[in-house]
């Protein structure tokens, strides 16, 4: 294979999956085939999309009821020649799913890149090992928290929140994705003030915390803004990838003047991936493509919290982020939304040690504040790695957290 293989889930009301697959393969490449003269067929053969797999799936009555028609469900795979497109994500996505995304009940499930094509993408600049080296933490999941309620607040409020989270043992603190450039907490001021706080905490408590600052602005201003962040001493860039595009992420990741890890936020991605019938699968969008384009971290809904993703999908995202690939470093999985200490054993059981445990309200809502919330999570992480039930841990902060949010992991065995 020298190009790319696209895998689709289709729902076809003509009940002829083979014919539908061939129509897609031709429609997204040379347009027609059977009526072409033999000489022209020979000329265009190398550009023709080729159907390589058609598999009928069992009927799904709920889908038929929802669509108000009977359809035949199936998985099809089509190979697209590299000759047809330039080696970039805009060209790849337009070739494999451009006008097809408007054509009925079709979902792009996966893209399989040839080795030749993989070479055109940067992958994570730091990856899991690089992030762990920055923090000098190699033996446990990382703990991340989020600034909460920052809109309309000043730098003093930010510094207080940051200090409390760092003292609580949090490894990474990230901006809220809805915190943009503003007069009260402008980008460079957040970075400089944050560095002062984190250095003070490190000198006093010996715990290192990194700050992920939200990179925002107009598309053509992003690189300049990122370079200002670098000059100010930023640790990590948080980036709302799907508000801008995967190619913009790649452009940032490839720039040697922006030598920072990039944390990809999933904002807006639900518009592409939420439907079971249309769009792009979450594992492809939030897993494989983010990793290829250069994300060191990928945030996505966990299977447990307030915006839950189906467990199978969440694990598939993580698989794409962390599976062995000689072309790319591994990216950190960050299952998120509604996470509290009682979920820690689930997260470690399902995602392993190479995961970032991300909490907002589960830290800030603790009765002992963000310091207590962070310490509760750290106690839960330590206990889980020792295979010790959380309710047996003699830690006042963890005990308080379990009283508030419960202990759904009571019977979890690692």
From Swiss-Prot:
It catalyses: 5-methylsulfanyl-2,3-dioxopentyl phosphate = 2-hydroxy-5-methylsulfanyl-3-oxopent-1-enyl phosphate. Binds 1 Mg(2+) ion per subunit. GO terms for molecular function: 2,3-diketo-5-methylthiopentyl-1-phosphate enolase activity; magnesium ion binding; ribulose-bisphosphate carboxylase activity. The modification N6-carboxylysine is found at residue 174. Its EC number is 5.3.2.5. InterPro entries: Diketo-Methiopentyl-P_enolase, RuBisCO, RuBisCO_lsu_C, RuBisCO_lsu_C_sf, RuBisCO_lsu_fd_N, RuBisCO_lsu_N_sf. Its cofactor is Mg(2+). It holds the Pfam family RuBisCO_large. Substrate binds at residues 148, 174-177, 265, 338, 360-361. Belongs to the RuBisCO large chain family. Type IV subfamily. Catalyzes the enolization of 2,3-diketo-5-methylthiopentyl-1-phosphate (DK-MTP-1-P) into 2-hydroxy-3-keto-5-methylthiopentenyl-1-phosphate (HK-MTPenyl-1-P). Homodimer. This is 2,3-diketo-5-methylthiopentyl-1-phosphate enolase. It comes from Bacillus cereus (strain ATCC 10987 / NRS 248).
